[in-house]
Amino acid sequence: MTQTVNVIGAGLAGSEAAYQLAERGIKVNLIEMRPVKQTPAHHTDKFAELVCSNSLRGNALTNGVGVLKEEMRRLNSIIIEAADKARVPAGGALAVDRHDFSGYITETLKNHENITVINEEINAIPDGYTIIATGPLTTETLAQEIVDITGKDQLYFYDAAAPIIEKESIDMDKVYLKSRYDKGEAAYLNCPMTEDEFNRFYDAVLEAEVAPVNSFEKEKYFEGCMPFEVMAERGRKTLLFGPMKPVGLEDPKTGKRPYAVVQLRQDDAAGTLYNIVGFQTHLKWGAQKEVIKLIPGLENVDIVRYGVMHRNTFINSPDVLNEKYELISQPNIQFAGQMTGVEGYVESAASGLVAGINLAHKILGKGEVVFPRETMIGSMAYYISHAKNNKNFQPMNANFGLLPSLETRIKDKKERYEAQANRALDYLKNFKKTL
């Protein structure tokens, strides 16, 4: 009798896992509670909806996530395929039209002969082979089930989404088109600030009213998606070294570097919507409007979606998962996505790719699949299952620091990254022959 796998959650990780299984002839029940039950952060019933930024970050091989994307591309990732098809201008980054992106994935999976989509809320983990990819907004009932099988308490922090604005309402006389250091095409609209303008903005942020947080939830932020008001609380200069960093963004009108810069990134294929880069926030909507109007060029801006903030949940993976994203105590259960402690869209999808390929091989009797540590995919899997500081385990992005050192030391960082990237792709090429 043919084995059927239950994949719970049709986000980035669940969609990727389901696709990898189905492409290898395995029958999949893809279980997604939306639209029967919505979450505080999702806006549609589409699979792999991007609820934070529309950027999948850097695309170059001198960037950790760029290497990860290229590895996935060579392994026929549905997420990367969709991103390449839905790409919008973003300099050296891979940004997408979020509607085209999730629409392509949804249609591909719904029409796959080996995938059955079930729209219902799951409150108990099914018997048999199961991949849990329920993401940051796992329901309380299912979260308790996960606590029961892992024996670990849940940890919480907040992901935050930036506001999206209409391009037509931007005062184009006050902004300029440029990518940092002129890398790639000029893809960002830049709002330059003088020191006085920045100080007024900064003071307003500190005084702005924050939306209330449930008392039972611990505030624990991951640095990669921190609310800008929390960054501001760390000191007046923090934003200047973060999302408002002016380095490499000289104003072509003056030839000089502004004191601070707010960047706007295209959010849709038509180029009518832009998001405010790095301005993920938990401010009340009225406060967001007042603060944003202090940014030069955005004085009369129309906000089409305010920033929101939502809980995230992840398990203490080094204690409970192996490199195949299997639950050590119950190997028929796998986890994928942010719940495993990988952080980021691409990283989440990569964990689903590993879980899906591994489970397909297990069912087909082909043996286990452990990616080489020299690959970015393998290094992420190794990190979540072997992190040394497992008493304070934190989510991790793809980065070159996760890869083993090169045999020959290279001082120049760019050259070192290029060498590590080439080695990763060489290892993947050889490893792929075993799949």
UniProtKB/Swiss-Prot annotation:
Binding residues for FAD: 9-14
Cofactor(s) of this protein: FAD
EC code(s) of this entry: 2.1.1.74
GO biological process, one term: tRNA methylation
GO molecular function list: flavin adenine dinucleotide binding; tRNA (uracil(54)-C5)-methyltransferase activity, 5,10-methylenetetrahydrofolate-dependent
SUPFAM superfamilies in alphabetical order: FAD/NAD(P)-binding domain (SSF51905)
Superkingdom per UniProt: Bacteria
First-tier enzyme category under EC: transferase
GO cellular component terms given for this protein: cytosol
Annotated localization: Cytoplasm
InterPro entries: FAD/NAD-bd_sf, MnmG-rel, MnmG-rel_CS, MnmG_N, TrmFO
Enzymatic reactions: uridine(54) in tRNA + (6R)-5,10-methylene-5,6,7,8-tetrahydrofolate + NADH + H(+) = 5-methyluridine(54) in tRNA + (6S)-5,6,7,8-tetrahydrofolate + NAD(+); uridine(54) in tRNA + (6R)-5,10-methylene-5,6,7,8-tetrahydrofolate + NADPH + H(+) = 5-methyluridine(54) in tRNA + (6S)-5,6,7,8-tetrahydrofolate + NADP(+)
PROSITE patterns with a match to the protein in the record: GIDA_2 (PS01281)
Main localisation: cytoplasm
Sorted UniProt keywords: Cytoplasm, FAD, Flavoprotein, Methyltransferase, NAD, NADP, Transferase, tRNA processing
Cited Pfam families: GIDA
General function of this protein: Catalyzes the folate-dependent formation of 5-methyl-uridine at position 54 (M-5-U54) in all tRNAs.
Stated family: Belongs to the MnmG family. TrmFO subfamily.
Official protein name in the record: Methylenetetrahydrofolate--tRNA-(uracil-5-)-methyltransferase TrmFO
Species of the source: Staphylococcus aureus (strain JH9)
Gene name in the database record: trmFO
